[in-house]
């Protein structure tokens, strides 16, 4: 999927009219039927089936909040299939509306800016369940998983559930990550996909439980490991390109500690600094081909990278300073490509400069618990996004090296450290 990008100056981008808020629309049965039909070929190709648990507790016309884990674009097609004919609105990243706002609103999408404070979103969700009498589909992770495990959830999810005061449904997919992991560059694998849809919290549960209890129930449901699931269930991924781009996730060598020297190609992951070579097996495990393996499980390697980043932050050694190509989004008409600059990140937060000295944006670590980061964003390139309600800045690292995963890890760990320091007083 591509996106409309227009070259212009930074001043021209700022002069764009701001986005005007519009209330969500209830998707028509015709649109829902068309979307379901359009989703059928991909689902048939994956031999898709869905197990439903406890759904009899929720009436067919009763609005509910549907939470779903986020592995790949197939997730939306799965939701369309398993929820039909229940009408629902979909919380969607605002850049997904660029160049096609009418269509996105017609199918029931609600725009929001990822990892930005957005009180309007809650009001829109309330409007859906109370006025439109529709359910709301929300991907609380707000981004695709890098390593096949759950990404951080917002602590505000429990408050949102209490405000909506409707039942909560969970859709958990199996095999979707194995079919199309984000790091693999949109290359589809042959993998069967299934889902489990269950009533996570009934109306009485929502009414009787406090925010902390609701959070615990939801957070518990979002504990998963797709690589472990693949191994334990004997799911074979035999494609010869299955390790392509794995260096985007496993960017640091655990043997020589070099960063940005890993290369994922074919079925192998090789460190171009020390020569250590791993093979990503058909069952998703790692096998070292020239020595003892430091890790045999992709998420374990990624967790180690997170620990390394945290240690750098605690010691004051962490710093990112890279040249970037900069795009902006002010409204949903287009993405504005405004020039080049530098993105700096350290314990004080993000600092983006560029466009001949005209752009100077600073974002504190406490601004968000995570970071909007993506691989091959709309087929343009790997991307880091910062910004606020006025504008979003999409930064595309230049000059090689895999920095996207590390920067997201650093943003998440820095947020935790700042919160802990504040709690200590």
What are these regions (language model features)?
Residues 214-229:
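Short, structured interface segments
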Residues 277-358:
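Long, charge-rich boundary regions
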Residues 277, 334-336, 356-361, 388-402:
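Short, surface-exposed beta-strand/loop "edge" segments at domain boundaries and coil↔beta transitions
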Residues 27-31, 44-216, 232-233, 240, ...:
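Soluble catalytic domains of membrane acyltransferases
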Residues 367-425:
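Acidic, Ser/Thr- and proline-rich intrinsically disordered linker/docking segments
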Residues 17-39:
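Helix-enriched interaction subdomains in cytosolic or periplasmic regions
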């Amino acid at each position: 999927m591509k996106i409309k990008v227009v070259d212009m100056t930074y001043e021209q981008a700022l002069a764009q009219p701001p986005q005007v808020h519009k209330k969500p629309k209830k998707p028509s049965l015709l649109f829902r039927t068309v979307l379901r039909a359009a989703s059928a070929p991909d689902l048939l190709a994956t031999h898709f089936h869905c197990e439903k648990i406890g759904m009899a507790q929720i009436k067919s016309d009763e609005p509910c909040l549907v939470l779903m884990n986020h592995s790949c674009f197939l997730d939306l097609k799965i939701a369309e299939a398993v929820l039909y004919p229940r009408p629902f609105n979909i919380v969607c990243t605002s850049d997904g509306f660029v160049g096609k706002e009418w269509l996105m609103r017609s199918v029931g999408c609600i725009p929001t800016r990822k990892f930005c404070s957005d009180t309007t979103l809650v009001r829109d969700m309330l409007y859906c369940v109370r006025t439109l009498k529709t359910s709301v589909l929300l991907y609380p992770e707000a981004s695709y998983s890098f390593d096949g495990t759950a990404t951080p959830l917002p602590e505000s999810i429990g408050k949102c559930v209490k405000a909506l005061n409707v039942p909560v449904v969970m859709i958990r997919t199996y095999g979707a990550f194995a079919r199309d992991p984000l790091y693999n560059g949109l290359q589809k694998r042959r993998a069967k996909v299934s889902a489990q849809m269950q009533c996570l919290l009934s109306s009485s549960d929502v009414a009787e439980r406090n925010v902390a209890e609701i959070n615990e129930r939801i957070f518990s449901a979002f504990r998963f490991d797709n690589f472990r699931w693949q191994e334990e269930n004997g799911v074979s991924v035999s494609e010869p390109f299955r390790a392509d781009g794995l260096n985007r996730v496993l960017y640091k060598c655990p043997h020589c500690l070099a960063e940005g020297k890993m290369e994922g190609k074919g079925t192998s992951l090789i460190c171009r600094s020390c020569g250590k070579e791993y093979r990503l097996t058909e069952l998703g495990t790692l096998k070292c081909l020239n020595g003892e393996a430091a890790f045999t499980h992709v998420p374990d390697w990624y967790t180690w990278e997170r620990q390394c980043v945290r240690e750098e932050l605690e010691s004051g050694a962490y710093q990112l300073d890279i040249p970037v190509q900069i795009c902006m989004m002010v409204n949903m008409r287009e993405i504005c490509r405004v020039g080049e600059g530098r993105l700096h990140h350290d314990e004080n937060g993000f600092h983006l400069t560029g466009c001949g000295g005209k752009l100077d944006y600073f974002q504190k670590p406490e601004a968000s618990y995570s970071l909007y980061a993506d691989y091959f964003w709309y087929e343009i390139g790997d991307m880091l996004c910062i910004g606020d309600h006025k504008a979003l800045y999409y930064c595309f690292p230049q000059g090689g090296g895999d920095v996207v995963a590390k920067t997201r890890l650093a943003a998440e760990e820095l947020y935790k450290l700042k919160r802990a320091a504040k709690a200590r007083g």
